């Protein structure tokens, strides 16, 4: 007997949606100089975007183009990406601090046309933002979401034509959360969570079927208030708070799908996940805090003198630099507020060499190095996301 739930598998593509898919595909082909990559140029994937954007094709096309350029710049491409993600040099050093699913798509439900994803919430938010630059964490979340998408796309290639898009089901464990840490919406870790949520909702729409919050705090009203900061109204409707863990496998999901820790029958035996399938994180100490400007020392130079720029509300500042043949770039910056940051070749925002990311530098500066920019004009773009306040920017760019 199936578990009782309001959320079943995603509906198959309708005739009306097929017409929209053809229209959106044509718009994207016109906008993208290299066309749509084959892996994401499927009817089911474009259907996900159309459903997620509710007919706002202008916003859809803009975000799809930025997503593709950012994916390429981050190196999150290739048929084996799902297998190599956890080994990437930009990802591997931070995995010890993150407790997230290693189940891939193994816990699969035909009834839901979805697989299970399990994550444990941060236990040390104040230390976390001293250990990760905003871009470090966003790139991890970006890459992880892309890995899940690739698993979805593989499933969709094999399924029958009468099925809808594949999705995943989230169990999000709040056991280690002190909800009062999240009362201040302006805190650095609240902002980081907000930006993370914005990224997956913008670039990976309609991939999540349902979000089950387990081990919730007693202050449920405060929990809903916090959730509203992170999620769209549509994704808020996907949340189910599980106060009694026996309900998860009794009322909502089949017992064989749910880890034993959450009242089900499943016990993971595949490393590096624990019995729930989640990687085991270690405690962050002060020795783990990020040390800025090390990339200058590693290349044997002192940090050059910084430049300053005031960026008016909602305006962009673009700094251009010509990189000679055989040279590379080192850079860093801090900003007084939130900004959209990207690095691209010349004037072509579709040719990103660093992903377009919404960033903050509350605790740590942003910095990095670029090796693949020899003999190119490179543009650093800083967009002030505030409509009211001037952004005070301090930045350094060095050629070596």
UniProtKB/Swiss-Prot annotation:
Domain CRAL-TRIO, residue spans: 87-270
Superkingdom of origin: Eukaryota
Annotated signal peptide: none
Name of one Pfam family that matches: CRAL_TRIO
Domain GOLD: 304-399
A GO CC term assigned to this protein in UniProt: cytoplasm
SUPFAM superfamilies from the UniProt entry: CRAL/TRIO domain
PANTHER family for this protein: CRAL-TRIO DOMAIN-CONTAINING PROTEIN C34C12.6, SEC14 RELATED PROTEIN
The protein's name: CRAL-TRIO domain-containing protein C34C12.6
Species, as recorded: Caenorhabditis elegans
């Amino acid at each position: 007997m199936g578990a009782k739930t309001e959320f079943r598998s995603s509906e198959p593509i309708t005739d009306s949606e097929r017409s929209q898919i053809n229209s959106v595909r044509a718009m994207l082909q016109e906008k993208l100089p290299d066309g749509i990559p084959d892996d994401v140029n499927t009817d089911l994937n474009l259907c996900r975007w159309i459903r997620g954007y509710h007919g706002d094709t202008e916003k859809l096309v803009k975000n799809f183009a930025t997503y593709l350029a950012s994916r390429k710049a981050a190196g999150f491409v290739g048929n084996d990406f799902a297998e190599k993600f956890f080994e990437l040099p930009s990802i591997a050093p931070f995995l010890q601090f993150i407790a997230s699913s290693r189940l891939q798509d193994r816990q699969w439900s035909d009834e839901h046309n979805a697989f299970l994803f399990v994550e444990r919430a941060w236990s040390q938010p104040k230390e976390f933002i001293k250990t990760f630059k905003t871009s470090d964490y966003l790139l991890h979340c970006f890459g992880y979401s892309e890995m899940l998408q690739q698993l979805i796309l593989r499933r969709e290639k094999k399924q029958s034509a009468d099925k809808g898009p594949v999705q995943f089901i989230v169990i999000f464990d709040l056991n280690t959360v002190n909800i009062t840490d999240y009362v201040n919406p302006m805190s650095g870790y609240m902002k980081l969570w907000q930006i993370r949520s914005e990224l997956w909702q913008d670039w990976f729409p309609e991939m999540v079927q349902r979000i089950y919050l387990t081990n919730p705090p007693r202050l449920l009203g405060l929990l809903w208030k916090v959730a509203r900061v992170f999620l769209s109204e549509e994704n808020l409707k996907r949340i189910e708070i599980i106060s009694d863990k026996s309900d998860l496998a009794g009322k909502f999901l089949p017992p064989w799908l749910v880890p034993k820790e959450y009242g089900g029958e499943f016990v993971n035996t595949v490393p590096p996940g624990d019995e729930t399938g989640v990687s085991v994180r270690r405690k962050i100490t002060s020795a783990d805090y990020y040390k800025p400007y090390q990339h200058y020392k590693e290349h044997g130079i002192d940090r050059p003198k910084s430049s300053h720029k005031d960026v008016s509300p909602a305006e962009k500042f673009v700094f251009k630099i010509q990189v000679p043949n055989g040279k590379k770039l080192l850079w860093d910056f801090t900003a007084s507020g939130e900004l959209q940051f990207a690095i691209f070749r010349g004037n072509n925002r579709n040719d990103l060499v660093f992903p377009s990311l919404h960033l903050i530098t509350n605790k740590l500066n942003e910095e990095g190095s670029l090796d693949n920019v020899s003999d190119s004009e490179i543009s650093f773009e800083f967009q002030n996301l505030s409509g009211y306040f001037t952004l005070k920017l301090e930045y350094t760019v060095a050629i070596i």
